[in-house]
């Protein structure tokens, strides 16, 4: 004998955060930041075979002010890093970042001084998508995982605190060029 049985039909019990998360996850507008071959796979997700529009991403935004998801596809050079950060800063809140491909995630095979060894040293990354290049199906799966994360993201002051902690942790992480083991 739960609460659902005592309420008349037509009532829905939820919180504002849960409802806002449900609405926000279905209306992402991505700002594409295609820098290499991963961008080709990202473009193919908008085609009829994979149809990213069925997940609420009807159009890719050409301006960061109208986007809330940045898909960084490919390697980021040291000269491109300030541009990436500027575009991220121009995006309105709430905003999310998806690092598409191993080059965006960790520098990939370009382990040299000219390439940023992971975009998480420039912007906070919410979802990492491995692969060289990752298939469109993998991008769609990563977007669905991001939908789950968005649905459980707090609002207001709680969200600002989570964002500050996430960004501080990402920028304080050890650069992959300094790591030992399989990465070197």
Swiss-Prot record:
It is a peripheral membrane protein. It catalyses: a quinone + NADH + 5 H(+)(in) = a quinol + NAD(+) + 4 H(+)(out). The keyword Acyltransferase does not apply. Gene3D superfamilies: 3.40.50.12280. [4Fe-4S] cluster binds at residues 37-38, 103, 132. Its EC number is 7.1.1.-. This is NADH-quinone oxidoreductase subunit B. The lineage of its organism: Bacteria, Bacillati, Actinomycetota, Actinomycetes, Mycobacteriales.
